[in-house]
Amino acid sequence: MMKMKTLLALAISGICAAGVANAHDHMAKPAGPSIEVKVQQLDPANGNKDVGTVTITESNYGLVFTPNLQGLAEGLHGFHIYENPSCEPKEKDGKLIAGLAAGGHWDSKGAKQHGYPWQDDAHLGDLPALTVLHDGTATNPVLAPRLKKLDEVRGHSIMIHAGGDNHSDHPAPLGGGGPRMACGVIK
């Protein structure tokens, strides 16, 4: 009888472990259509450098942005969808600005203010901040709950800023993320 209880306990433990592993696999890989965006670190003087990809996937909760990036500065970085499908530099006030051809934060609903990704009266292109670890990698996915379909973001670009994002226009405009650091065109 003791052997039977032990076998039963082991069987239940195995089933539970398999269920947890299966749930983890589903959490780690959102189901649904996806596109992969090539991302480059912006350097107008010496040429852009590949730093990895961001995979955008449809989920029941919104679009999931899963970075697979390396070679970036550690810390939190502003992460946005920009208006134009370009990462080219453009001149402003006599200076060549990295990624300026991408335009501004994507704002198709005319909110005209920076905010949180779930905030209805903010730019649609406002995403959660991107976390870069001490080794220069970024792999933690972020969710954009107001964006539902890949077709919404095609024909725009992804922008990563040198600084963090306070999801407000105060004290600095557009979250205070500073210079455009890396970019990828969403095709």
From Swiss-Prot:
Cu cation binds at H80, H105, H161. Belongs to the Cu-Zn superoxide dismutase family. Binds 1 copper ion per subunit. Zn(2+) binds at H105, H114, H123, D126. Gene3D superfamilies: Superoxide dismutase, copper/zinc binding domain. CDD domains: Cu-Zn_Superoxide_Dismutase. Residues 1-23 form the signal peptide. It is found in: Periplasm. This is Superoxide dismutase [Cu-Zn]-like. It comes from Haemophilus influenzae. The record marks Y82 as: Ancestral copper-binding site. Its cofactor is Cu cation; Zn(2+). This protein lacks enzymatic activity (probably because of the presence of a tyrosine instead of a histidine at residue 82). One of its GO terms (biological process) is superoxide metabolic process. GO terms for molecular function: copper ion binding. Keywords: Copper, Disulfide bond, Metal-binding, Periplasm, Signal, Zinc. GO terms for cellular component: periplasmic space. Disulfide bonds join C87-C183. Homodimer.
